[in-house]
Amino acid sequence: MSAQDFLVELGTEELPPKTLVSLADAFLAGIEKGLAGAGLTYSAKQVYAAPRRLAVLITALATQQPDRSVNLDGPPRQAAFDADGNPTQAALGFAKKCGVDLSEIDQSGPKLRYSQTILGKPTTSLLPTIVEDSLNDLPIAKRMRWGARKEEFVRPTQWLVMLFGDQVVDCTILAQSAGRHSRGHRFHHPQDVRISSPAGYLSDLRAAHVLADFNERRQIISKRVDELATQQEGTAIVPPSLLDEVAGLVEWPVPLVCSFEERFLEVPQEALITTMQDNQKYFCLLDVDGKLLPRFITVANIESKDPAQIIAGNEKVVRPRLTDAEFFFKQDKKQKLETFNDRLKNVVFQAQLGSVFDKAERVSKLAAYIAPRIGGDAQRAARAGLLSKCDLSSEMVGEFPEMQGIAGYYYAKADGEPEDVALALNEQYMPRGAGAELPTTLTGAAVAIADKLDTLVGIFGIGMLPTGSKDPYALRRAALGILRILIEKKLDLNLVETVKFAVAQFGAKIKPAGLAEQVLDFIFDRLRARYEDEGVDVAVYLSVRALQPASALDFDQRVQAVQAFRKLPQAAALAAVNKRVSNLLSKAEGSIAQTVEPKYFDNANEFSLYSAIQQADHAIQPMAAERQYSESLARLAMLREPVDAFFEAVMVNAEDANVRANRYALLSRLRGLFLGVADISLLG
């Protein structure tokens, strides 16, 4: 079957840069779906996206649908004709349904059948609907109308190119009649651009100063920004999201180096970086020590004959924003950070839980409780907790919300607070996302855990549990943050006691009954998904969860040990034995004795197992004391042979009550050794 290349380009006013890639990908996906539904084959696909256009190129697209056969089965033959061979209403109705005379129906089989060959339609007749459906299905949060038209799209449409081979596909979509003329750069080539063929699309636009390939523009910007940064003896800060956004803003990227006055470097560099990145879309430069340089890179959308004019314009635009940041910083520093606390008394944290000031006081007490238990200083943690929310009422954070914690750090430093106290004001918000940086100080870790735990206990205490995708207080993230800090920083904190302490801080504001258990379950349940992401089988998680360890670090150490145990050749058999023993013990009548009496042994295999258990118990006691769980399980794996021999030769439920009870005690002792690490029976 013959094939031709297909190109569709929708021209618009400037598209939202942050959603440009997602719109383009969805456009391609919609066209792929339409082609698949129509049974049209092709050899390759490519999507293009620029500020004023979305385009898809399909290579070697079949020129026509394949013919297809359709078989329709009707009523059984005996129901289609009466005894005299005359057609019944069932037969006549089937023929009418097929739109043919009964004579055209196949009557040779057990059922009437009508076979029809449906000729494939020309691809050109199918493409308009495929393209239109794809555009209508784009993930656009809010569509707009323009002029007096009824059509809606993310931005007003301006032109439409649709070529199949060398021919224009005749159609009208979103108020635009298809043609072969695109448009070039607004300034370099404001005239229409004739697209010679689908394959020539990129080169035709390149000649008109438009780089339609998003990835090409992104690579050009990234490479040139790095080159310019090196020339300035610095390193560019290039967040992927900012790079994507800038690539979505320009059709012909030209990076240029600009500068600002060095006096602004007295302002916390995070504030300067925030305003330059978020508001101006600039790439900031750092020196070898990670300090901000008084220069930045802007990406122009024009190759100017006078780049100095563009540079001067950007420097003029950024100056007021930097001046604002400087003003807020100086205003805030006129008073000590601690004085901002009073303003927080009028800022509501949550209506039922009190003000942000109340929260800071709770965090202070909880951090002081946590700190010495993880090796930190209680007084410094208490101080950091008390100051933790002060910067929320500062001018700087009011203008730049992203500076919360960071501003507090600089103000605390200026006030002469200890370094770890100042750092804790920023580290309280760590980790700020999945895989993000963790606190570097024990004071910071204590405050970070306290802040998150206070939120969890408080919100759970008033019954506002997260449901489905709704989690307005980010409780899942808070729980994961606590776990990451404790596990990855190897901090051994008893969460059971800590949560109880946190509950007590709220007094009558919450309902304490069962609250601690509810919060603990929520926190430890987060570990299930964490381990699944790491490739740990859920059975391993459940085997440890059954023991309800109080420490997240201890929980993790047990999981790692069980994960290693599962790889041992004895693991499956011992898991099955533990399950068998667990079932036997659950059916035991009365209480099981705590001690084993060798005098009731009447089988050599009982003696062998008892001796092996004694030796194993003696060997793993020092391991258990040091939480060497992997070593403990490896040692217990050596019990497989005496355990197997015991069950092959010994009837546990002996007729003699003393013998039977003693065997239960022996098995209970065996199971207890494994339960020192995890419930291995759940691995089976």
Swiss-Prot record:
It comes from Pseudomonas syringae pv. syringae (strain B728a). GO terms for cellular component: cytosol. It is found in: Cytoplasm. The gene is glyS. NCBIfam families: glyS. InterPro entries: DALR_anticod-bd (IPR008909), Gly-tRNA-synth_bsu (IPR015944), Gly-tRNA-synth_heterodimer (IPR006194). Keywords: Aminoacyl-tRNA synthetase, ATP-binding, Cytoplasm, Ligase, Nucleotide-binding, Protein biosynthesis. Belongs to the class-II aminoacyl-tRNA synthetase family. It comes from the Bacteria. The keyword Ligase applies. Its main location: cytoplasm. This is Glycine--tRNA ligase beta subunit. SUPFAM superfamilies: HD-domain/PDEase-like.
